[in-house]
């Protein structure tokens, strides 16, 4: 359902206050389905990370780069099969021991998702279709993985979208001055992107970067 005019107008006013030029979306992994999957899962409730003086990275970015180096020797056509065949416990030592919920590590969720995609012959970025219900179900069918990170997974493969995470939702809530769900926040950002004639991914990243760096200190709190 379309947002009300008042909500969309308020959101557009808030977006107009974001300093320009907007921070550019850093891009994802258009040629690496395995890295997109690792990033999507490792980013759940985890900071993106920052570069250390030695060139290594902390956070989710660091985990992805470690796995990239670890799997560098694998032939491109075998990347997803290699990920699906990983021992989750061994993979934890490369990534980290964070969990998607109390009973499952992120490494375990990554391997399970890779196995599910492998079972339906989705092994390369070109095979994945964001609007395919079966493809979505293979991802969200893994306990701990949901629709928000599914959309982020597809964004990392160069498909347009919005990852309606905590910062996106909070920005929208502050803009419209009421509580909203992740689904509603994502829909509003998409409507705003359409109104502004920009890619959804571009607006998503601009809002996320602004919200996460300013902690929304200049925006009015919910009354």
Predicted segments with their positions:
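Alpha-helical ds-nucleic-acid-binding substructure associated with the helix-hairpin-helix region
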Residues: 67-142
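Structure-specific DNA junction-binding interface
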Residues: 1-100
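C-terminal accessory module of base-excision DNA glycosylases/AP lyases that mediates lesion recognition
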Residues: 1-31, 35, 105-115, 125-223
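Short alpha-helix boundary/capping elements
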Residues: 42-50, 72, 118, 161, ...
């Amino acid at each position: 359902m379309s947002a009300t005019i008042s909500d969309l107008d308020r959101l557009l006013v808030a977006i107009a206050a974001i300093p320009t030029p907007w921070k550019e979306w850093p891009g994802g992994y258009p040629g690496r389905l395995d890295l997109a999957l690792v990033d999507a899962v490792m980013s759940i409730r985890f900071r993106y990370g920052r570069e250390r003086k030695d060139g290594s990275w902390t956070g989710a970015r660091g985990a992805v780069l470690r796995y990239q180096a670890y799997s560098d020797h694998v032939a491109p056509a075998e990347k997803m099969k290699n990920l699906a065949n990983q021992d989750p416990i061994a993979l934890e030592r490369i990534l980290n021991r964070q969990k998607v919920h109390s009973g499952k590590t992120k490494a375990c969720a990554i391997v399970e998702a890779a196995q599910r995609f492998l079972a339906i012959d989705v092994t390369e970025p070109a095979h994945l279709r964001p609007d395919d219900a079966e493809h979505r179900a293979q991802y969200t069918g893994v306990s701990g993985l949901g629709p928000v990170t599914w959309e982020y997974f597809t964004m990392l493969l160069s498909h347009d979208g919005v990852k309606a995470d905590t910062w996106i939702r909070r920005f929208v809530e502050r803009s419209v001055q009421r509580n909203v769900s992740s689904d509603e926040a994502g829909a509003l950002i998409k409507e705003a992107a359409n109104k502004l004639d920009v890619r959804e991914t571009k607006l998503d990243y601009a809002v996320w970067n602004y919200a996460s760096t300013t902690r929304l200190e200049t925006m009015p709190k919910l009354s």
